[in-house]
UniProtKB/Swiss-Prot annotation:
Chain's role: One of the primary rRNA binding proteins, it binds directly near the 3'-end of the 23S rRNA, where it nucleates assembly of the 50S subunit.
Biological source species: Corynebacterium diphtheriae (strain ATCC 700971 / NCTC 13129 / Biotype gravis)
HAMAP family referenced in this protein's UniProt entry, alphabetically: Ribosomal_uL3_B (MF_01325_B)
Subunit structure: Part of the 50S ribosomal subunit. Forms a cluster with proteins L14 and L19.
The protein's name: Large ribosomal subunit protein uL3
GO biological process, one term: translation
Length: 218
């Protein structure tokens, strides 16, 4: 675990583009509209057993918030938001309810972890879903070329073990990609440019945090 203070923000994946570095090399980047978020709750060791802040992102019509959510946001002194996330950290003394959290928190940070929901692929077979090689193309194979094959033993244990890799729903998983390089921050436009690809579809909600491995300032 890195000793770097953990910071995080919610944002929207806008898509990918490319920029040029000082040596005129092309760098593929993902553009994320990060924040602005607002602090809606502060958790401490004394009251909750751990330190964390809850941040909210995305304006909504206040009339569309249910009563529990409306009351929660009212207590924080902010208007209702669409998305809420909790960021654990060692010290929350620098935060207060209603405080804005912007992309500027990543100034000086070189590496981040990005969490998002991957693209849904629908119902997929074992070859596409798990990379199975498939069965032989000839020698008596009848319409089973892409099937799984054996999924267990016979009378012992007499069942299929949980987690056996078979066909099923593929994608729509919560995934974190670690140690992505921060190429550029545009505080005026609330944008952060991250080298490479990140999980999710264009327009998907992502969480950007300082990298927990390898050192965010490396």
């Amino acid at each position: 675990m890195s000793e770097t203070e953990i910071k995080g923000i919610l944002g929207t994946k806008l898509g990918m583009t490319q920029i040029f570095d000082e040596d005129n090399r092309v760098i593929p980047v993902t553009v994320v509209e990060a924040g602005p978020c607002v602090v809606t709750q502060i958790r401490t060791v004394e009251t909750d057993g751990y330190n964390a802040i809850q941040i909210a992102y995305g304006e909504i019509d206040p009339r569309k918030a249910n009563k529990p959510a409306a009351g929660h946001f009212k207590k924080a002194g902010v208007t209702p938001r669409r998305h809420v996330a909790e960021i654990r950290m060692d010290d929350v003394s620098g935060y207060e309810l209603g405080q804005d959290v912007t992309v500027e928190i990543f100034e000086g940070i070189n590496f981040v972890d990005v969490t998002g929901t991957t693209k849904g692929k629908g119902y997929a077979g074992a070859m596409k879903r798990h990379g199975f090689a498939g069965q032989g193309a000839a020698h008596g194979n009848q319409a089973a070329h892409r099937r799984v094959g054996g999924i267990g033993a016979c009378a012992t244990p007499g069942r299929v073990f949980k987690g056996t890799r078979m066909a099923g729903r593929m994608g729509s998983d919560r995934v974190t990609t670690q140690n992505l390089k921060v190429q550029k921050i545009d505080a005026d436009a609330n944008l952060i440019l991250i080298k490479g690809a990140i999980p999710g579809v264009r327009g998907g909600i992502v969480t950007v945090k300082t990298a927990v491995k390898g050192g965010a300032h490396a």
